[in-house]
C-alpha cells in the first residue's frame, strides 16, 4: 500500500508496506493525466524510512515496467530513506533513467522538498 499526494511541482509517494502491482497502477492513474496534459511531471519524492521491498517477483517486474514507461516524463526523483545502500541508487539509476535522481536521509525530507522547489515550483 502507498500514500500518494500531489504538491505544486512534485508528487509524494509514501510506501506503507511491500510494493505491489496495484501500487504502481495507482501511481500511474494519478500521474499519467498530468503527463498527458503537461508533457511531464517535475518531480517525485519517494519517502520511506526503510524500503519495504515487493510482495512478489511479479511486483518487482511491474516496478521495472513503471520506471521504463515513465522515466522520460519525470524530471527529478528524490529517494528519502535510511535504507542501507540507498546512497548508491542515484549512480546506478543514472545509467537507466533520464531523471535527475538524488538520495536524502529520511530526516532530511525538508532538503528533498527544497531541491524539488529549486526546479522552479513552490509547494
What are these regions (language model features)?
Residues 1-123:
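Amphipathic, Lys/Arg-enriched alpha-helical "gate/interface" segment within cytosolic domains
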Amino acid at each position: 500500500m502507498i500514500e500518494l499526494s500531489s504538491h505544486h511541482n512534485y508528487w509524494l509517494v509514501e510506501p506503507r508496506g511491500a510494493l505491489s502491482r496495484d501500487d504502481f497502477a495507482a501511481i500511474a492513474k494519478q500521474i499519467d493525466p498530468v503527463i498527458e496534459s503537461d508533457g511531464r511531471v517535475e518531480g517525485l519524492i519517494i519517502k520511506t524510512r526503510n524500503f519495504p521491498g515487493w510482495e512478489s517477483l511479479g511486483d518487482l517486474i511491474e516496478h521495472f515496467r513503471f520506471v521504463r514507461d515513465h522515466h522520460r516524463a519525470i524530471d527529478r526523483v528524490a529517494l528519502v530513506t535510511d535504507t542501507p545502500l540507498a546512497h548508491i541508487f542515484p549512480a546506478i539509476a543514472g545509467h537507466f533513467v533520464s531523471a535527475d535522481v538524488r538520495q536524502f536521509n529520511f530526516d532530511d525530507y525538508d532538503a528533498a522538498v527544497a531541491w524539488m522547489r529549486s526546479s522552479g515550483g513552490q509547494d
